């Protein structure tokens, strides 16, 4: 299992050596950021520079090529102005899921208002609804369905924040806050009954689309 604190220190040292004062933010997202990582979980790192060019990306790729667990590294690389100009409905999850190690997301986070969060919920539910129908008719994939259920968790995080002003990162803690109808979506772990699981997710997303529409 990865010692993520040790690994992130090595990553930060390497980024400082590579980009120096151009670094605006370094952070960690995903299962490692939430303390829910398993063996083989991706390392979702965030690197925000003053700007990003093709040369920067080549430098970045070269810098991380020799790191341990290179095959697990993914995440988000961006220039700071692009991030500030990003759609705020999308920025909601980004900001609240990121554990910042260098720099701060506070300025960007403070620009996100209640309607941006509503749009995050609505757009997420719309994408799940479409993905569920497409998968039922065309792909018929349990793996895709599993991914859609994972997306539903992020929508539920946004919905809970919209209703309470509290962001809950960990799945188990989120499950404990949900009413039975929503909790059944979070608790699904097996996808052997494809039709029933698809039906449940489709009905859940349809209800949310209607509730959160402008």
What are these regions (language model features)?
Residues 1-17, 21, 33-39, 50-214:
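Catalytic core of pol beta-like nucleotidyltransferases
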